[in-house]
């Protein structure tokens, strides 16, 4: 049983977050290890394993990038330990330029405002790539979706760097 089936959801990228959360709570309640306190050792172990699977499934499905990777894994495309790199020189150049721009934010006259503007730009870029990913997954364009996920991972790392710079400015 895959994660979507576990939660009674259609196997697709777009999902109803509130339905996912309510299904998660119901499954958590049903398979909580405390409910099996008087059960046999085997049943208690199975309950713990089931609870762990429910938690893993929820963490995967609630995160758009992890959900997309999981959808690809259902198609036989594994990205977790992949050695394939992104082959888009324009995108990679843009990422280098963005990182340089982020490094220069602290030297601006108003670094907080510069960081907010930079973050807004990166967030818009992230939304753009997520929309493209959604379309590619809906059209079963698995390899294009895999490339899009790679791009989104670069952007996620950049967003983490933005948070790091923000912490420096505030700290």
Curated annotation (Swiss-Prot):
Pfam families: HSCB_C
Gene Ontology biological-process annotations: [2Fe-2S] cluster assembly; protein complex oligomerization; protein folding
SUPFAM superfamilies in the cross-refs: Chaperone J-domain, HSC20 (HSCB), C-terminal oligomerisation domain
Function: Co-chaperone involved in the maturation of iron-sulfur cluster-containing proteins. Seems to help targeting proteins to be folded toward HscA.
Gene3D superfamilies xref list: DnaJ domain, HscB, C-terminal domain
One Gene Ontology CC term in the entry: iron-sulfur cluster transfer complex
An example Gene Ontology molecular-function term: protein-folding chaperone binding
Entry keyword Chaperone: yes
Name of the protein in its database record: Co-chaperone protein HscB homolog
Annotated keywords: Chaperone
Domain J: 2-74
Subunit field text: Interacts with HscA and stimulates its ATPase activity.
Residues making up the signal peptide according to the UniProt record: none
């Amino acid at each position: 049983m895959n994660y979507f089936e576990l939660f009674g959801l259609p196997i697709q990228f777009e999902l109803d977050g509130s339905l996912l959360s309510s299904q998660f709570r119901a499954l958590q309640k049903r398979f909580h290890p405390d409910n099996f306190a008087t059960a046999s050792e085997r049943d208690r172990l199975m309950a713990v394993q089931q609870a762990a699977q429910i938690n893993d499934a929820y963490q995967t499905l609630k995160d758009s990038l992890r959900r997309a990777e999981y959808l690809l894994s259902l198609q036989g495309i594994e990205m977790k330990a992949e050695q394939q790199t992104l082959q888009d020189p324009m995108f990679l150049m843009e990422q280098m330029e963005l990182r340089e721009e982020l490094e220069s934010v602290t030297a601006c006259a108003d670094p907080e405002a510069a960081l907010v503007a930079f973050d807004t730009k990166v967030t818009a870029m992230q939304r753009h790539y997520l929309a493209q990913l959604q379309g590619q997954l809906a059209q079963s364009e698995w390899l294009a979706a895999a490339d899009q996920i790679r791009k989104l991972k670069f952007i996620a790392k950049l967003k983490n760097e933005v948070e790091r710079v923000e912490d420096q400015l505030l700290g």
